[in-house]
């Protein structure tokens, strides 16, 4: 799967100052990651001293890690300079945090890390990678013995209401439907590709349903999050778009809102 990183970086940079107002699901996912990390390390003798936060965005997960592990040093990496600027303000330029602009796929591919980490975390990031499973495998060498890699990402049922509505609209119009948005790996696919690479692998899957007043509001919120990337090369006609919205409303509207499903995966890997 090819992801145009320049397009991704541009979208998130434009949304950097709006992101914290609309990223409700991503914040819940960050909180859940730290909860899982706390549970995993409950019986550990030592707290993590070195943490890598991949795709730190506006620093929400970075702050959560600082709360749980105040003595740790954190390297926070993101593709977007604008996101990093917001993150630095959000953590009040904490002396234990170093912000690094970069593409984690290039970083792990081009040179080994000069340091290793007790914990590597990534919240709602790996769906934006060209080769997510290969990158996770390469990150294995960045972990200390018994180190933890814990990440969240989205599964294939994410926005299934939207994709279903597009498919039905395409069928009614007699056109070929191209999936819009990203192709997400399933829990089974992650397990199959990561089995054997780590001493321990655990994957949790949880569904989150967000409610919106209209389909338009839902799509506008996704745009504010910077998550409007599409692999489809075909322009979206006004007729196709309008019919999709009508079908979405007819099939999924409750009394006062329409739902959007987020299929959340939480993956814990121990070296």
Swiss-Prot record:
Example of a GO MF term: malonyl-CoA methyltransferase activity
Region forming the signal peptide: none
EC code: 2.1.1.197
Top-tier EC class: transferase
Keywords, comma-separated and alphabetical: Biotin biosynthesis, Methyltransferase, S-adenosyl-L-methionine, Transferase
GO biological process, one term: methylation
SUPFAM superfamilies: S-adenosyl-L-methionine-dependent methyltransferases
Pathway the protein contributes to: Cofactor biosynthesis; biotin biosynthesis
Catalysed transformations (reactions): malonyl-[ACP] + S-adenosyl-L-methionine = malonyl-[ACP] methyl ester + S-adenosyl-L-homocysteine
Family assignment from sequence similarity: Belongs to the methyltransferase superfamily.
NCBIfam families: BioC
Record's function text: Converts the free carboxyl group of a malonyl-thioester to its methyl ester by transfer of a methyl group from S-adenosyl-L-methionine (SAM). It allows to synthesize pimeloyl-ACP via the fatty acid synthetic pathway.
Protein name (database record): Malonyl-[acyl-carrier protein] O-methyltransferase
Source species of the chain: Halalkalibacterium halodurans (strain ATCC BAA-125 / DSM 18197 / FERM 7344 / JCM 9153 / C-125)
Organismal lineage: Bacteria, Bacillati, Bacillota, Bacilli, Bacillales
């Amino acid at each position: 799967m090819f992801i145009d990183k320049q397009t991704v970086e541009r979208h998130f940079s434009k949304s950097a100052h709006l992101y914290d107002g609309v990223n409700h699901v991503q914040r819940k996912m960050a909180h859940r990651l730290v909860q899982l990390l706390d549970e995993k390390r409950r019986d550990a003798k030592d707290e993590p001293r070195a943490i890598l936060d991949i795709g730190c965005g506006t620093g929400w997960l970075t702050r959560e890690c600082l709360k749980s592990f105040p003595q740790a040093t954190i390297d926070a990496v993101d593709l977007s300079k604008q996101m990093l600027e917001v993150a630095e303000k959000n953590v009040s330029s904490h002396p234990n945090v170093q912000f690094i602009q970069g593409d984690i796929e290039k970083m792990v591919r081009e040179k080994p890390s000069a340091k290793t980490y007790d914990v590597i975390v990534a919240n709602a990031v790996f769906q934006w990678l060209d080769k997510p499973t290969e990158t996770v495998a390469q990150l294995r060498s960045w972990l200390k013995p018994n180190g933890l890699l814990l990440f969240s990402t989205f599964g294939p049922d994410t926005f299934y209401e939207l994709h279903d509505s597009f498919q039905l609209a395409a069928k009614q119009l007699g056109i070929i439907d191209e999936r819009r948005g990203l192709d997400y790996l399933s829990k089974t696919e992650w397990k199959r590709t990561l089995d054997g690479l780590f001493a321990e692998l655990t994957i949790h899957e949880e569904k989150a349903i967000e409610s919106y007043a209209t389909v338009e509001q839902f799509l506008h919120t996704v745009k504010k999050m910077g998550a409007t990337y599409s692999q489809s090369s075909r322009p979206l006609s006004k007729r196709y778009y309008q019919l999709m919205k009508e079908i979405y409303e007819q099939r999924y509207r409750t009394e006062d809102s329409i739902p959007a499903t987020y299929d959340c995966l939480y993956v814990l890997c121990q070296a």
